[in-house]
Every structure is written in structure tokens, then in C-alpha cells.
From Swiss-Prot:
Motif residue range(s): Antp-type hexapeptide: 168-173
Organism domain of life: Eukaryota
Compositionally biased intervals (Polar residues): 116-125, 205-215, 449-464
Name this polypeptide is given: Homeobox protein Hox-B3a
Listed InterPro entries: DUF4074 (IPR025281), HD (IPR001356), HD_metazoa (IPR020479), Homeobox_Antennapedia_CS (IPR001827), Homeobox_CS (IPR017970), Homeodomain-like_sf (IPR009057)
GO biological process, alphabetically ordered: anterior/posterior pattern specification; embryonic skeletal system morphogenesis
Bias (Low complexity) ranges: 130-157, 185-204, 274-292
Keyword Cell inner membrane part of the UniProt annotation: no
Length: 474
């Protein structure tokens, strides 16, 4: 590649509506690629000026858009015909340049390569038209090659002339933008022009993909009311209903799906905070024990698995108004093989009683008639199995509670009642055991197991579930 001299003729640059002229030798034209010189713009309204250039034959043979191989004359003739039919606009310029930058059909002819004619002054428009009619093929070949070489120079950004790097023409900027659009059109906002703009406006969810942060969707109050109503009836939305709501509320399916996801998370959070507050504030009014109690009961259940699958129903809460003097529990005579300390191994127990889980008061939570439910101390323990029946829930005001499983012998009695010995309000220091404490041994079948007061050494249990030995021995 050899350097060429370049003379800028600045008086002919008019606002970008210009065609570019490249002088090339006859050999370079036969080669299919004209010699590259700096383009000199020629306006529509002015006589065509030509830059006085002298150029060697074989300079800058490179094309970005043309698909011809070097030195093929057949493809060069095809390119001539293509350039003629497209009125010298250039097949590659049409795809890359906007229409206002396309060169017009009035192209000044190339000069013969001798330097004397190359140094001639201004050429008249009439003369330019005459010579353009004479040298049609030469002109078309050089114009198309000038277009291709100009695009190649801008895209490859390797100009042969150092002065060309300093001057940036509007077509260079435009072509750089178009190559940028081609390579990264999905991520470029200004890339596809109206297409990406309209798609950004059409899609209400995220705007165009060039914006890294999605715009926050603002729901109207009417939309929120409808969404909340739907969430109240159904927390999980099926697809047909989602499509219906999207059409109804003028939202996209994706927005409705994401709204429901967020609403479910909020609902879970609310439930969790409600559960924590109710567990700290006494028995929960909904009938299911608080979350901490449930987890403790399941922990106890895993330590001492009951027969019949280990699952249990949550008993209905006792009516707070009437205290039961003798709350009878359904103590089934059949237990699972819970290892009990000091008991003979012939105590084999079967599945629990069939009427377990009945929300009758004798299955309900244990109530002390004297310990009022308004006592300020919180319920610190957790519900436990008593026998094969339902929960034993700790008394409010009983402090850290201890539980023991009722040890029934292999007696065929179907139900046994537990009476409360009518002690006063249970103090926080005294512990109360379910089961046959007192004079009979732990394995003797107590016919009427009474609540017996224990010594104060059991008060160290911090409201948590007791270890297995403390649970079973009395």
C-alpha cells in the first residue's frame, strides 16, 4: 500500500448531500477495485470540482461489502451492471447509510491517470455530463469501488492517509453507528431506531432491554383492588384466569404473575409475624397452637413416636368461659413401645384409641379450674402427647412446666379420667405432672391419676421440652 497525496477542496462540502469521487487508474479499474484516495464531496447545486491528485496504480485494494475476490474480471462486470441498475447508489451503501447520505446519480467522471490532465482546473457541468456518458462503465466501476472502499475504511478504521484520520466526515460517523447497530442491535437503544423505541413503549413491563434497571410498575387503585380480591379467593392463579385478568386489567401476564408472587411472600411474612406474636401472648385464638409450640410438639413426637403413624389432629381449643372440674382424657390402654424407666417389659401397647382427635371437651386442652386464663405470665411450655390421646398444653401461670406420659398398666379399662386435685392457683414454682406420681410406683396402674405437686428442683426446665428421662420418670 502506497501513500497518496491528498488535497482537500473545502469549498465543495455542502451539508452531506454529496457524492464521492475516487480517481483510479485503468489497471485498478480492471482489477475491480479502484485506487483509494480521500473522497471529495460534490454538491448537487455547484459545478463539480476535482481535486488535483496524482496516484499510483495499485493502492489500497480492500472492500468491506463487496463479495468479489481480488482480480476477478467477471465479478467486476457483474458489479458494473449492479451499480448501473441501482443508479450508482452502491449495493452496500443502501443497507448501511441512511437515505439522505446516498450519492446521487450525478457523479463526476474519473480523470485519466496522466498527471497533466489530473492537474487541470475546474470542470464545467456540461463537460462532466458529456464525459460521464462516454465513460459509463469506468465511472460505475470506480464509483462502486469508491463506495465499498469508503465503507471498508470506516469499518476497518485503517485509513492509508494520516490526514484522513484527523478528518471525520458525516458518512464515517454514520457508518460507524450502523456497524455498531448491526453487531449489538438488541442491546443498543438507538440501534434499531423506531423499532426498539416502539418495542420499548409497547412492553409496559421493562422498557427497552438497554436499560439495566427495570422501571417500577405503577398499579392503579382499581387494578390493586381486583388483584387483592382475586388473591383473597385464590392465592395461586391458574393460567386461564391469569390471561383473563390480564385482559381485564390491561396488564401483562408477567406482571400479574409477579404481583401474585410478591403478594404470597408478603402473606407468608404476615403469617409468620402473627404466629410469633400470638405464641408470646398466650394460646392462639385460631385453634392451632403457636408456631413454637408446634415445633416443640413435633420434636417431642420424634423423640417418643406414638403408634398409628405419629400424626395427630390439632384439638379444638377449650371454651374459656367454663372450667371443667374433671377434664377426662381419652387414655387408650394401648400405647406404642415407649421405653419407660423401671417398668417391666411386658407393657406392650397398640394403636391409639379410635375416637382420638374428637373435638369433645374431654379431648381438649387441659384446663385448671382455679388457674384463671387472665394470668399475666406467658405460656412458656409446649404441647405434648398425653397417653394416646391429644395434647397436654402447659398451664398459663404454671411457669416452666414438666410433662410425663401416663403410665397405664395392661388393664383393659378403656377410658380413665384425670381429676384435678383442687389445689389453689398453680404457683410458678410448683410443677404439675400428668400421670401417676405419688405413692404408687411409676408402673403401677393408677385408676385415678391425680395432679400431684412436685418439689421445686424441677423448676430449672426453662420452658423448653424436657429431656427424655425427665419426661418419663416421676
Amino acid at each position: 500500500m502506497q501513500k497518496t497525496t491528498y488535497y482537500d477542496n473545502s469549498s465543495t462540502l455542502f451539508g452531506g448531500y454529496s457524492s464521492y469521487q475516487v480517481q483510479g487508474a485503468a489497471a485498478a479499474a480492471a482489477n475491480g477495485f479502484g485506487g483509494y484516495d480521500a473522497p471529495v464531496p460534490v454538491s448537487h447545486h455547484q459545478p463539480a470540482f476535482q481535486s488535483a491528485t496524482h496516484l499510483d496504480v495499485d493502492s489500497y485494494q480492500r472492500s468491506a461489502c463487496s463479495l468479489q475476490s481480488l482480480g476477478s474480471t467477471n465479478s467486476h462486470q457483474q458489479q458494473q451492471q449492479l451499480a448501473k441498475t441501482k443508479e450508482l447508489n452502491g449495493s452496500c451503501m443502501r443497507s448501511s447509510l441512511p437515505p439522505e447520505h446516498h450519492p446521487s446519480s450525478q457523479v463526476s467522471p474519473p480523470l485519466p491517470p496522466n498527471p497533466t490532465n489530473g492537474n487541470s482546473g475546474a470542470q464545467q457541468p456540461g463537460g462532466s455530463a458529456g464525459t460521464s456518458s462516454k465513460s459509463g462503465s469506468n465511472k460505475s466501476s470506480t464509483s462502486s469501488s469508491s463506495i465499498s472502499s469508503s465503507t471498508s475504511s470506516s469499518s476497518s478504521s485503517l485509513p492509508p492517509n494520516p490526514t484522513l484520520a484527523k478528518q471525520i466526515f458525516p458518512w464515517m460517523k454514520e457508518c460507524r453507528q450502523t456497524t455498531k447497530q448491526k453487531t449489538c442491535s438488541p442491546s443498543n437503544n438507538s440501534g434499531n431506531g423506531a423499532e426498539s423505541g416502539s418495542s420499548g413503549e409497547k412492553s409496559p413491563t421493562g422498557g427497552s432491554s438497554a436499560s439495566s434497571k427495570r422501571a417500577r410498575t405503577a398499579y392503579t387503585s382499581a387494578q390493586l383492588v381486583e388483584l387483592e380480591k382475586e388473591f383473597h379467593f385464590n392465592r395461586y392463579l391458574c393460567r386461564p384466569r391469569r390471561v383473563e385478568m390480564a385482559n381485564l386489567l390491561n396488564l401483562s401476564e408477567r406482571q400479574i404473575k409477579i404481583w401474585f408472587q410478591n403478594r404470597r411472600m408478603k402473606y407468608k411474612k404476615d403469617q409468620k409475624s402473627k404466629g410469633l406474636s400470638s405464641s408470646s401472648g398466650g394460646p392462639s385464638p385460631t385453634g392451632s397452637p403457636p408456631l413454637t409450640m408446634q415445633s416443640s410438639a413435633s420434636y417431642l413426637n420424634s423423640m417418643h413416636p406414638m403408634g398409628g403413624g405419629g400424626g395427630y389432629d390439632v384439638p379444638s381449643p377449650p371454651s374459656f368461659g367454663k372450667p371443667h372440674q374433671g377434664v377426662s382424657y381419652a387414655m387408650s390402654t394401648a400405647y406404642s413401645n415407649v421405653p419407660v424407666k423401671g417398668c417391666p417389659p411386658q407393657q406392650k401397647y397398640g394403636p391409639p384409641d379410635p375416637d382420638y382427635g374428637d373435638p369433645h371437651p374431654h379431648h381438649s386442652l387441659v384446663q385448671a379450674n382455679s388457674a384463671g386464663y387472665g394470668t399475666p405470665t406467658n405460656m412458656q411450655g409446649s404441647p405434648v402427647y398425653v397417653g394416646g390421646g391429644s395434647y397436654l398444653e402447659p398451664m398459663p401461670g404454671s411457669g416452666p412446666s414438666m410433662y410425663g406420659l401416663n403410665h397405664l398398666g395392661p388393664t383393659p379399662t378403656h377410658h380413665q379420667t384425670m381429676d384435678y386435685n383442687g389445689a389453689g392457683p398453680m404457683s410458678a414454682t410448683n410443677q404439675h405432672h400428668v400421670g401417676g406420681g405419688g405413692p404408687p410406683g411409676p408402673c403401677d396402674p393408677p385408676t385415678h391419676p391425680t395432679y400431684t405437686e412436685l418439689s421445686a428442683h424441677h423448676t430449672s426446665s426453662q420452658g423448653r421440652i424436657q429431656e427424655a428421662p425427665k419426661l418419663t420418670h416421676l
